[in-house]
Amino acid sequence: SLMFVFILGCNSSTQNYLSEEKKVGGLTDSVEILRDEWGINHIYANNQKDLFFAQGYAAAQDRLFQFEIWRRQSTGTVAEILGPDELARDIGTRLFQFRGDITTELNHYHPEGKEIIESYVQGVNSYIKEILKTPEQLPLPFKMLGISPQLWTPEVVISRHQGLLGNIGQELQIGRAVALIGAEKVKELLWFHPQDPEINLDKEIDKAILFEDILAPYFAYRKTVRFKEEHLKESFRKKESMAFLNLYNDLSEDSLDLGSNNWVVAGNKTADGNTYMANDPHRTIAVPSLRYMAHLVAPGWNVIGGGEPEIPGISIGHNEFGAWGLTVFRTDGEDLYQYEINPKNALQYKHNGVWKDFTVIEEIIPVKGGAPEKVRLYYSHHGPVTYRNEQKNIAYAVRCAWLEPGGSPYLASLRMDQAQTWEQFQEACTYSNIPGENMIWADKKGNIGWQAVGIAPIRSNHSGLVPVPANGKYEWNDYLPIIQKPNALNPEKGFIATANQN
């Protein structure tokens, strides 16, 4: 059905209000979007479906090029617009795509996650269809590259290509260092705290192979999209154009390792007796921003704050009852496994003394300026295979906790957005698998709290800090319930602070 969307904007210098009425297919009732003097959308809807439809519509309208780059990163179609240099990225993206049950996945993030995410996608697509009717109005970067935005699916929203805060590269580096100088010397040079982890390499590990590029697909798909002069249409190939377009180079950069900070203070420590929450998550300064501010209002919803532009809901913010923020709480959710390939059948690998078949998926990747590339993706029962050496009959695969349902970064914030009490907020936190975070809470009833989140494998036989052979000795024993991670409620000292800055 076609309903009205009201969009109002305010020019702060003249105090003139502009209004626009639009008929938008896909809404079930009228929606009002008030755009304030800072460009923040305050969305008022009469039901949940329309609320998230409108969030998707408005966010796509504001960040269309950012949305299209995200979509291509998440679907493994960057080479289609930038050429063969991006083929490795697209292969890696497809290798690490979530391939589980999509309904289970969507409903992890909220009891009505499927409805919310599908409504959001419908809103995004509604705006894309609208702008494609007048392509001359597309933002300039589309014209510079000679491309058009394409439609979204829920699979685009739940992409794992960004914000993972993985540590598998460090595990490989530690393994290489141990191979060169031994575990004790590595412990002297690196700072392992507060425990003394086991980092000796299993005798089955081929030390020479560790120095091969065994994580190439993993690193390729997580790198930033970089634009070059040859990517542009000839009429735009000049210095000014490149300077403009390269503002977008940091779209997927994530500088959280620089150190984020947050704190909550109880009312007995403040002049007015209220609880306070403050948060400064350190992210790359980019144009457009890596955050997107919005205010979402509908029955059961009244939340304002910042979130990832391409996902529904609010990641950091407040509702009528409380406020929350986050910093990184690093959690090791990845392990690197070495396999023996069957010398008589390269489609098999040995696990725990038994030959098993690799799962093989064939994909066709479009490539600008060339023929489509047909690739084969291999999977062991642990996960994506990143390296195969059929001369030495060795393969490596990554087991990733974030390929379980619920591994899309920040999306479980949807549950936090409706929390009315500390207990409800803490329950919402138990669904927050990725990334590992220190979630803090302050509410109007005077409570302050902290809950560490992030999916954490239980390892009984190894530290997870070096590559291990797939001989059955180094398996995960389920996941630690998030509620058992560090937490606190109303500590006697009257405040809680978390920080990543030494």
Positions of the model-derived regions?
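Substrate-recognition/specificity elements adjacent to catalytic centers across diverse enzyme folds
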Residues: 15-276, 281-284
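Targeting-peptide/extracellular-domain and disordered-appendage signature
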Residues: 377-411, 425, 434
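Hydrophobic alpha-helical segments
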Residues: 312, 394, 434-502
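C-terminal motif of bacterial Sec signal peptides marking the signal peptidase cleavage site
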Residues: 7-9
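NTP-handling and nucleic-acid-processing catalytic cores
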Residues: 242-336
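Alpha/propeptide regions of enzymes that mature by internal proteolysis
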Residues: 33, 409-431
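Compact, glycine/acidic-enriched structural inserts
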Residues: 302-372, 416
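Short helix/loop capping segments that flank catalytic or ligand/cofactor-binding pockets
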Residues: 44, 52-54, 160-161, 273-274, ...
